[in-house]
Each structure stands twice: as C-alpha cells, then as structure tokens.
Regions:
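C-terminal and inter-domain tail/linker signature
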Residues: 1-123
C-alpha cells in the first residue's frame, strides 16, 4: 500500500479501526468514533440501520453488534482506492447461531454454516 496518498492512508487506517471496533471489540462507541459527524448506516437486506449519531449508535448497540455470531470471520479479498473512498471485497463466514434480522430478516437461527462474498464501499 505504498502507493497511497496520505489522505488514502488515513482513510485506510480509519476503516481498519472501524472494522476492528465492529467485529472484534463489538463496541458501538468505538465504531461511532470512526464515523463522520452525521453518520448513516443502512443494512440492505433488512432496510434497517440508523441516521445521525444517536440513530446509528442505537442500531449498533441493539440490533447489529449483539447479533454477530461468535465465530464471525471477515476476510478481505481486495481493496480498491479512489480519491475519497475504499471499495473492499470480503468473504464472510459464520455459524448461524443467532437471529440476525439486520442480515437475514425473519430467518431464525439454523445452526448452519454461512459463507458469502460481499462488496462494501463505505462513503
């Protein structure tokens, strides 16, 4: 990643802190500290999320972070950098041991393995 501009390096460091806060620490306040002053989160499968710091914190603390299975694994396959954004391709793997309405709305925990690819582009 030596070819990144200083701004892109800062974006990457912030993104890494953010995903660590989400998937390792599972800490809404630490994740929120990596976001803009007026964040917006939308979980596409369910249409849930939050707007503004209060709304995003509530979504993270009540619907998202506590509903991440303990064996959740996020593996980065590639990152593409634009001037002001990162597009990242992941493989996500977990055992469906929790109801995850933010990702699988209305699907009760099945105990089955789940593996899928995801392209994410935080704005």
């Amino acid at each position: 990643m030596n070819n990144l501009t200083p701004y892109q390096q800062t974006m990457l460091a912030t993104w890494q802190q953010h995903t660590y806060a989400e998937f390792v620490l599972k800490d809404a306040d630490v994740a929120l500290a990596t976001m803009s002053e007026n964040p917006y989160v939308l979980a596409i499968p369910s249409g849930t999320g939050g707007m503004g710091r209060i709304g995003v914190r509530e979504f993270y603390a009540s619907q998202f972070l506590p509903k991440i299975p303990p064996d959740f694994d996020l593996t980065s396959l590639s990152q593409t950098f634009g001037y002001d954004r990162i597009v990242e391709e992941f493989v996500i793997r977990f055992t469906h041991t929790l109801d995850m309405d933010w990702m699988l709305p209305g699907v009760r925990a099945t105990g089955r393995r789940v593996d899928f690819a995801l392209v994410h582009h935080p704005v």
